[in-house]
Each structure stands twice: as C-alpha cells, then as structure tokens.
Curated annotation (Swiss-Prot):
Region (Disordered), start-end ranges: 196-222
Keywords: Phosphoprotein
Modified residues annotated as Phosphoserine in this record: 211
Name of the molecule in the record: Uncharacterized protein C22E12.18
InterPro entries: GCIP-like, GCIP-like_N
Biased composition (Acidic residues): 201-215
Gene3D superfamilies: I/LWEQ domain, Talin, central domain
Source domain of life: Eukaryota
Gene Ontology, cellular component aspect: cytosol; nucleus
C-alpha cells in the first residue's frame, strides 16, 4: 500500500470517528424524546417564547445544508468535521425546545407536533451523517432499521420548515391549516355520497383493477338504489351540510390566539374525531356494512361533543347562542 493510500485511509478513519461522535449525540437525543421532563423557558425568551422554535429550526436547516454541500466532491476532512460539529451544537437546543413546550403548559398539539418534527429532524440528521461518511457508521438501532432509513434530507428540511412555521404562527396557524383539510375531506365525503345516491359505485373500489379500461367496463352500469337507500343518503347529506357549517363557524369564531392552548387542543382533537367519523360513516354506507348504525351513533356523538366544547369550554361571547342553537338542531337532525 502506497504512502498516499495509507494517508487517505487514516484521514477517512478520522472522518468516521468524528462523524460517529456526532451520531452518538443524535441517537442519544432521539431516545430521550419519549421520556423528557419539562423545563422552564429561558428568561430572555419569555416575551416571545415561540421564537425559540424558529431560531432552532433555522440553525439546523442552515448547518445541515452546509454539511450536505461540503460532502460534494472535492470532499475535505476539515469541512466535513466543521459542519458536522456545528450541526451537533443544535441538538441540545432542539431537545430543550421539546422540553420547554410541554403538554402541561402549551397543550398537546404543540407538544405532539414538535416531538414528531424533532424525531424526523434527528432521523434526517442521522441519514445525512451516514450518507456523507466514507465508511459505514455505528449506532444502528432498531428504530433506524424500521423507520429512520426511510427519512431523507428532503424530509429533514421539510420538518425544519414545519418547526419554523410552528414558531412563527403558533398553534392557531397549525390549526387553521388542518381545519382547511378537515373541510376539504368533508367536501370529498359529500361528493362520494352524492355519487352513491346517483348509483355510481366507482372510485372507491378500483385499486385492484388491472387497467383504466377494466375499471370503466366494470362500472359501466349504474347501480339501482332503493328508496330507503336514497332517503338514508339524503339524511346523511343533510347532516354533513350541518357539520360543514359548524366547522366553518368554529374556524371563524373559536380558533383564535385569545383562547388558551388547552381549549384549542381539546377543540382540535374533537374536530379530528368528527372528521374521522365522517369518513367512517360514508365508507360504511358505500359498502352497505352491517356496522353502519354503530358508526352513525359515533358520528352523531362526535359532532355533538365538538359543538359542546365550543359552548362550555370557551369564554361565553355573542356567538355562544349560535352554537347552542346548532346543538339544539343537531339533536333533532340526529334522530332522523
């Protein structure tokens, strides 16, 4: 072996050693995510606590980008080690952010979202370290084998952006975005139900078709709906319309920064349950499932609970009577 090869081999070994040191920090931090004690926010951030999230995510994004660029030929040991070590300095602030924004003080939405994004960031950093290393790195965990290896730098940077957005817009910004998704899914459910009522069975059982032509041929004939089925579909459409009005009203009147995070979290969870129950009930009617009545009861109950939260868990205002009236009408509609 020539002197040059020996020198290159030694340099690669030093790079691997340095990257393994950083990787150990990352893997250890990721294991801590599921069992962390809350800590207080640094005094200098009390006035704008969410800015901590934005600052941490921005730094991680910057350093991981620099490391990714440094790994392109010609690769130098100094550049790799410098940016890997710089990146390592962001791990502690990231974990601290998860500890600061705990569920007890800031609500489950921020805590759960932040933990999810932080885990993806850490997996992404691990993936980046492994990709730039000249030799395989250690610390291969079961989590890495099953989930981490599927994370790439694109997901890493997307997660950084999600944390930045959470830091910029807070829980309200996140909820408004998700709320639009709820309404969109509700619209899709209404559309599917209209198709069902008209006798169109396509679009919800085509995944196994060998070709588009096969699919069209299989569903070329409309399915006859009985009067009872049509009445049931119309009744459910009426309820979905009522739920859409409720969702839009909540978005306008209840998803505001003036409400505590605990209330907003309770509201979000109830909305998600209602949205999920809508998907379930429409799927049940399409498949003519015998469990339809149970799913229908669950749908009625989840929508009722969502409205009750708007009445009882928020400070009474001029719009509280509207929610009370909606609930009153829902009790009538849900009996049909």
């Amino acid at each position: 072996m020539s002197d040059t090869m020996v020198k290159n081999q030694a340099e690669e070994d030093e790079i691997v050693k340095s990257l393994n040191n950083v990787l150990k920090i990352v893997v250890t931090a990721r294991k801590c995510l599921d069992d962390m004690k809350p800590i207080e926010l640094p005094s200098e951030l009390v006035e704008s606590p969410l800015s901590m999230l934005k600052d941490v995510a921005t730094l991680i994004h910057q350093y991981t980008t620099k490391l990714s660029v440094a790994a392109k030929p010609p690769i130098t040991r100094d550049a790799l080690e410098k940016y890997a070590n710089d990146m390592a300095t962001t791990i502690t602030p990231l974990i601290a952010a998860v500890q600061v924004f705990n569920a007890e003080k800031y609500g489950e939405i921020i805590q759960n979202r932040l933990k999810m994004y932080a885990e993806r960031v850490l997996f992404g950093i691990e993936a980046l370290l492994r990709s730039v290393s000249p030799k395989p790195l250690g610390y291969i965990s079961e989590d890495w084998k099953t989930r981490g290896r599927l994370i790439d730098t694109g997901i890493l940077w997307e997660s950084c952006e999600k944390i930045e957005k959470l830091g910029s817009e807070g829980i309200v910004g996140y909820m408004l975005e998700e709320w639009d998704n709820f309404v969109s899914m509700l619209e899709d459910a209404r559309s599917d139900l209209e198709d069902y009522k008209e006798g169109d069975d396509s679009n919800w059982d085509d995944f196994g078709s060998e070709s588009e032509d096969d699919s069209k041929e299989a569903h070329s004939e409309e399915v006859f709906r009985s009067e009872e089925q049509i009445q049931l579909a119309n009744s459910l459409l009426q309820k979905l319309n009522a739920c859409k009005i409720l969702f839009l009203s909540i978005k306008k009147r209840r998803i505001k920064n003036e409400y505590p995070n605990t209330f907003l979290g309770e509201l979000f969870n109830a909305a998600k349950q209602t949205s999920d129950s809508i998907d379930d009930i429409v799927a049940q009617i399409q498949e003519d499932d015998e469990n339809f009545e149970n799913e229908l009861d669950n749908f009625h109950r989840s929508a009722r609970n969502l409205c009750k939260i708007c009445i009882s868990s928020a400070q009474e205002d001029s719009f509280t009577p509207w929610f009370s009236k909606w609930l009153e009408n829902w009790e009538i509609v849900s009996q049909k």
